[in-house]
Amino acid sequence: MHLSLLKAKIHRATVTHSELNYEGSIAIDGLLLEATGIREFEQVHIWDVTNGARFSTYAIRAEEGSGIISLNGGAARHVQVGDLIIVAAFAGMSEDEAKTFKPNLVYVDAHNAISHTNHSIPTQAA
């Protein structure tokens, strides 16, 4: 069996730019790409916490340490500057690989600087 598991996520990043006339993508601060292991041109899912929009695009690198999270092209129509988003990437793997796999979870502050990282999500309580 082939499974698709969460590979990485950037949790509650703040959209800094929305560029409708730029070639489609999401530009992400290079430090965040490195911390998550998301590769340039990799497909990512965007979940807008502010307005509920959900869509996919591909990642491109923004300047390291810039805090840039820029939705470009058609994706810019789904967000506004200041929206909080989750950026997620998934990876395919076998059931055996999935048994030991741990995702790279990156949590950011209001300026999109890394506040902490983890490899698991706490159990949700009632």
UniProtKB/Swiss-Prot annotation:
It is an enzyme of class 4 (lyase). Catalyzes the pyruvoyl-dependent decarboxylation of aspartate to produce beta-alanine. It catalyses: L-aspartate + H(+) = beta-alanine + CO2. The active site is at S25, Y58. This is Aspartate 1-decarboxylase. Is synthesized initially as an inactive proenzyme, which is activated by self-cleavage at a specific serine bond to produce a beta-subunit with a hydroxyl group at its C-terminus and an alpha-subunit with a pyruvoyl group at its N-terminus. Pfam families: Asp_decarbox. Binds 1 pyruvoyl group covalently per subunit. Pathway: Cofactor biosynthesis; (R)-pantothenate biosynthesis; beta-alanine from L-aspartate: step 1/1. Its EC number is 4.1.1.11. The gene is panD. The lineage of its organism: Bacteria, Pseudomonadati, Pseudomonadota, Gammaproteobacteria, Lysobacterales. It comes from Xanthomonas campestris pv. campestris (strain B100). The keyword Lyase applies. Belongs to the PanD family.
